[in-house]
C-alpha cells in the first residue's frame, strides 16, 4: 500500500530562502508537543490517514506571485518525512476542495501535446539519420572490405592516379620448394592443375602445403560461396601407387575401410566408429592419416545440398495426344508413342530424330549412364538395354543401382531419365527412347549424403566404357545459392575430358536448373557454368520459355520439356514397371540431349567432347523458339540467354558429324586486369575496360570466363554485363531477389558461350550494376579465353572484321555453310513464327535458293525477313523496297548536313544534336534523332524486304520512332511537333533490368544524378539541424524551469513525546516561520476535511 501524502502550503515571504534554510537546519532537533485540549487526537489522525491511503492532499494559500512554498509529508506509516520545495507549476489558489486543480488540468492538457511534439521530432530526426546512413554506410563497408582483403595478404591496390599498365598474361605460380611438398613418384600433377578454381577454398588453397601435403587436410578453408553441411564418416585419400595393395594397408592400419577407387591414386575411405553426421571434424583420425608417410593428401568429407531438377506430378494435359506430322512418321507399337510429341510432331516443331533413325542411327554401341537416385534395372522397357558395367550404387557401395522404394516414390527420378534415353522400341510397352539402341546404366548417388568424394566417384565411373554421363541435379535452385563442384569433382571433370573414352574425352551433359520462379541464374551453378559440361535448357510445347527456366550465358542448347498446365509433358518409364506422361523440368531436357548425343557418337566414334559442342553450336535451330532476348553475336550466330543457340537437331547433327574433322587443340589464355579496386555506389554502375592483344594462341573463341572477386552487403543486387570486341553483349549475372548474402563472389568464373567463334583481340568491357542500397566493391577481374589458334574446320573462312553489324538479309557466320539440294526435307518444312498470328507464317514456296535451312533469295512477289520469305511482312516490321531504301539514304544525308572535316568522329554532329534543349525536353525525339543520324548505307538490298520497326511500334511505315502507325498494348499515339510517337500510359523506370550503353550516354545524365544527390543530401542535413535545434530548445527550456524549483529538502518530523509505549502518540512538525492562516484540503475527498483551521495552529506555529 502506498503511503499517504499531505502538503502544507504557505505564502512565501521575503525571507523565503532563510526560512527554507532554517527549516532544514531545525530538522535535526527534536520538539515535544502534546495537545490535550485539541479536538483532534492521535487515533483519529491515524484513522483519517488510513482512509486517505493512496491519496494526495495539498495546502494552499492565496498567492501574490507565481510561486508557492509547499511542504509534502508522508504520513502513511506514522513517520512524518516532509519535503520542502518551491514550485512555479501551481499557478492558482485552491479556493475550495471540490474544485479541480487548474494546475493539474493544465499539466494534463500539456502532456499529450508534449508527447506529440517529441514523437514528431524523433521521427523527423530518425528519417534524416536513416537517409544519411544509407548514403554513407556502404562507404564504411567498402573500407572494411578493403582492409580485410589487405589484412588477408592481398597486395594493396594501386592508386587511381598511377599510370595504367598493360594487362599481364597470368603465369602459373611456381611450385613450392621440394622440401615443403611431397613429390608424386609418377610425376603426375597435384590434385588440381593451377588454373582450375577450387570451389571449396575460393581459389586460395589449391597448392597450400600442410605438413608436407597438398591442400588443407581436415579443413576446407573459408568459402563464402559454398554452404557446407555436416561432417560424414568418410574420407578422400590420395595414396600414390595405391593399386598394389598400399591403399588397403593404409586403411587397415588406421581402422578405415577402403570403399573403392575414386580415380587414379585417390580412394574413398570410411571409418565405422566415426559418427555419420557430426558438426565437428574427427581430428584424431585426420591426424593419423596426415602423419602417415604413405598418404599424400587426405580430407574428411562434408555433405552437400543437391536437388533433383523435376517437380511434383502435374495433371496430364487435356490437349490432343497426337500431333499432325509433316514428315513420314515411323511405325512403333509402343503404347505411348503417339503421345511423344517432341519426337513425332514434324514440321520443324520437334527435335528431328526420325530422319536420323531412318539413316540407321539408333545409338547402337554407345553407353550412357544416369547419375541420379537409382535405376530400376528390371523395368520391361529398360532391361534389354541395361548395362551393369555402367552402373553402381555409391550410396550403398555395391553394384546394384536399384532405387530405394518409399510411399511417395521419391526415388523415381533416375528411372524416368533413363527411359528417355534408351527405352526399348517396338516392345508394345510404354515409350521409345531417343537412342533406343544404346546401352544405359545408372548410378545411385543422390539417395544419401552427397559429398565431394561421392560426386567425383560417380563422375569417374568406368570412363573407358561409359561415353556419356547425364546429370539432372545440382545445387539448390532457390535464387540465393552460389555453389559448384568441389576439389575432387573438378578433378573428375578434368580427368574425364582428358583421359575418358581413350583420350577423346567423356561427355558430361547437365540440366541448367529449375530456379526460374525464384529468379535464379544458372551462372551461379558451378556445374552448368563449367566449360567441361554441356548445359541444356528447356522449351515448352509452344516454343516458349518455361516458367521454371533459368537464364544464363553458359546455356549451350535446348530440348523440349514441360510447360504450363495446358501444355504436354515428357513420356518415359516410371517406378514399379510403369509408365508416365508427366516427366517435367530441365530434368527431362538433359536426358533427351544425352540421347541425341548418343546418336551423334554412333555416326562418328572419333568425336571429342569439344567436337560435340562445336556441332551443337552450328546445328541448333533458333526457329520456333520465342524469346525477346534473341541476338546475333560477332560472327552472325543467333543466341539467347534462355535457349542458348537453339533447339537441338538430331538429324542435322548426325549429318554434320559424319564429315566432321577433329577441331584443333584447345588453347588457353588468361589476362589479368590491372588496378581493379573500384567502388560501386548504390543504384549506379561502373564500366571497366580491358585491352587484349597478347593472346596470340587463341584466335577463335569457344568458352570465355570472367573470374571476378566482388564484395557486397547484398549479393543479389549485383548485375554483370560483358561486351566483347565484336560488340556482343552478354549478361553474366541477373538480379537475384532472394540472395541476401554478404559474401559476394570470390574468384567466381562467370562463363559465356555467346562469343563462340569470335576473336578475343580488342577491348573487353565489364559493366557492373549495383541496384541496392549498399556499396559494393570489385577487387579482381581476370579474363580466361578458351579456343583455337586456327579455324575449327579446315574449310571455315576467317572473318577479319568482326562486328555485330550483321547483314539483316543473309548469313554472316564465319564457318562454311554447306549447301545441299533444296528438294530435301528442309525445303518442305514450315518455319513457324509467332503462334496465333497467321500473317507471320513464312512462305517456303516463295524461296528460290536455299542454303543450310536459310533462304538466300525470294521471288518478286515475296518479302524477305530473317532468312525467310513472307507474303506479308510480319508484325513489328514494315515493307522496304530497294528504291525506298535509297531515298531514305539520301534524306539521311540531308539531315546530317555537312561533316566537319576536322572532326574526330563522323558522329560529332549527331552528338551535338543529342545535347540540344529539345532532347532534354523530350527523350523520344532525342532517340529519334539519334536513330536518324545512325542510319547507314544499305548495301545490296534485295528488291523486297521487311525491316524492323522501332520497338515502341506495333505496326509502322518506317524505322523511326516517329513513324508508328499503331502502338503496342499500354501505349497510345501522340502528336508532338507534327510528328507522332507512341507514349506509354504509365512511364515506369526499368533501371533494374536495363542495360545502359555507356558509349551512348551523354554527360548530362551524370550531372543530373549528381545534382539530385547533392540536393537530397542538403535537404537531409537541413532537416537534421532543424530537428536538433528544436530539440535543444525544448531541453534548454525544461532545464531552465527545473532550475527555478528547488530540489526536495528533508524536514525531520519527530514525535511530541519520547515515550515509545504510547501508541496514540501524535507526530507534529515544527516550523520556524511565523504563524499564518492555513487551510488543509484532501484532493480525493471533497466532503471531508482532515484538519480544521484552528487545529493547524498546533502544527504550524
UniProtKB/Swiss-Prot annotation:
Database matches in CDD domains: FU, Peptidases_S8_Protein_convertases_Kexins_Furin-like
Identify the stretch(es) annotated as Disordered. Answer: 1-57, 150-187, 886-915
Q: Which cofactor does it need?
A: Ca(2+)
Q: Has the keyword Transport been applied to this entry?
A: no
User: What is the membrane topology noted in the UniProt record heading this document?
Assistant: Multi-pass membrane protein
Where does this protein have compositionally biased stretches of type Pro residues? 164-178
| Enzyme Commission number(s) | 3.4.21.75
Segments spanning the bilayer are 119-139, 1014-1034
Q: Which GO terms describe its biological process?
A: glutamate receptor clustering; peptide hormone processing; postsynaptic membrane organization; presynaptic membrane organization; synaptic target recognition
Q: What is its main location?
A: Golgi
**Domain annotation P/Homo B: ranges:** 662-791
Question: Active site annotated at which positions?
Answer: 372, 413, 587
Q: Which keywords annotate this record? A: Cleavage on pair of basic residues, Disulfide bond, Glycoprotein, Golgi apparatus, Hydrolase, Membrane, Protease, Serine protease, Signal, Transmembrane, Transmembrane helix, Zymogen
Question: Which residues have a glycan attached per UniProt?
Answer: 15, 18, 28, 108, 333, 426, 606, 727, 859, 978
Q: Name one Pfam family in it.
A: P_proprotein
Q: What are the annotated GO cellular component locations?
A: Golgi membrane; plasma membrane; trans-Golgi network
Query: Polar residues composition bias: which ranges?
Result: 38-57, 901-915
Its EC top class is hydrolase
The UniProt entry, under SMART domains, shows: FU
Low complexity bias located where? 13-28, 150-163
Q: Which reaction does it catalyse?
A: Release of mature proteins from their proproteins by cleavage of -Arg-Xaa-Yaa-Arg-|-Zaa- bonds, where Xaa can be any amino acid and Yaa is Arg or Lys. Releases albumin, complement component C3 and von Willebrand factor from their respective precursors
Q: Which InterPro entries match?
A: Furin_repeat, Galactose-bd-like_sf, Growth_fac_rcpt_cys_sf, Kexin/furin, P_dom, Peptidase_S8/S53_dom, Peptidase_S8/S53_dom_sf, Peptidase_S8_Asp-AS
Which tissues is it found in, per the record?
In adults, isoform 1-CRR is expressed in CNS, fat body, and female reproductive tissues, and in embryos, in anal pads, hindgut, developing antennomaxillary complex, oenocytes, clipeolabrum, pharynx, trachea, CNS and developing posterior spiracles.
Q: Which family is this protein grouped under?
A: Belongs to the peptidase S8 family. Furin subfamily.
Its function, per the record, reads: Furin is likely to represent the ubiquitous endoprotease activity within constitutive secretory pathways and capable of cleavage at the RX(K/R)R consensus motif.
Q: What is this protein called?
A: Furin-like protease 1, isoform 1-CRR
Source organism lineage?
Answer: Eukaryota, Metazoa, Ecdysozoa, Arthropoda, Hexapoda
